[in-house]
Amino acid sequence: HSKSFLLKHWALGLPDLHLLLLAPVSQNDLVGIVGGHSAPQGRWPWQISLRVYSYRWAAWVHICGGSLIHPQWVLTAAHCIGRKDADPSAYRVQAGNVFLYGDTKLLHVNRVIVHPDYVNAFLGSDVALLRLAKPAVCSANIKPVRLSSLSDSITPRDQCWVTGWGAISMFGSLPPPFRLQQVEVQVVKNAVCEQQYHNASRHRHRDRRIILDDMLCAGSEGRSACYGDSGGPLVCKVTGSWRLVGVVSWGIGCALRNIPGVYARVQSFVPWIQQQMRRYT
């Protein structure tokens, strides 16, 4: 994780990197998904774990989160996949279990579609679709989430949650039994988020935008998504039902003061997602 953490800081040109990396973090301040709690079974039935095979562990290991958006389709972050010509057989999906390694029946993937405009997370378009070889059997614990529609207006007043199995602080990973974590976060307006990131980078990027239109910010001090949660869902309650509003994309550290996490804004990609699903379902 330290490598990706360094890369994140380098890309943003942040000062005093060594201070951020070595700053002591009290485990009392950062628990769960960073300020979160264990998730009840079935509360977030669209949450999936994306796996790749590790020869070191001789097992399919968790690399990212994702969301079931149709019985046969998963939405995750493009940076979880990386290559546009990724081999679908290199991936597996676990659905329907809050325990990360509690289920031996993993789902196969037979198509991977990385957004054509994706270069890296900082430049946006950080979304990818995975088509499952067979549709997931829906149940109380496995259910697709509705996509945020273009007409939804998401504000800081909305009830929003982020979930995942990632690190619980900048310096520690989730301990066994690897139970799904949940945390309530607040959406931050893009203009406010932009200012916060410019302040964090000491205005080294004043000539360019950091938070693009296809991004969305959320978090609050001590509560945030962290490394292993990439690709996972940010959902908000819109007119009484949960909508997938964001895909965990990038950020500086974890749950730092006045620095929200950055998500791919699902609304921006709905036409593309629907087009791909129609084309390949």
Regions found by a protein language model. Give the residues of each.
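Protease-domain processing segments flanking chymotrypsin-fold serine proteases, especially trypsin-like
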Residues: H1-L75, R92, D214
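Conserved H-D interstitial segment of serine endopeptidase catalytic domains
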Residues: Q27, L50-Y53, V74-A77, G82-N120, ...
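Conserved, non-catalytic sequence blocks in retroelement Pol enzymes and Pol-derived host proteins
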Residues: G35-G42, Y118-F122, R206-R208, A225
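A structural motif
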Residues: W46-R51, V74-T76, A128-R131, D158-G164, ...
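Extracellular trypsin-like serine protease catalytic domains
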Residues: Q47-A59, L174-T281
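Conserved beta-strand elements of beta-rich interaction domains across eukaryotes
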Residues: Y55, W73-V74, C80-I81, V98-L100, ...
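Conserved active-site neighborhood of the chymotrypsin/trypsin-like protease fold
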Residues: V74-A78, G124-S149, T281
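Active-site substrate-binding loop(s) of clan PA
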Residues: D117-V119, P135-Q186
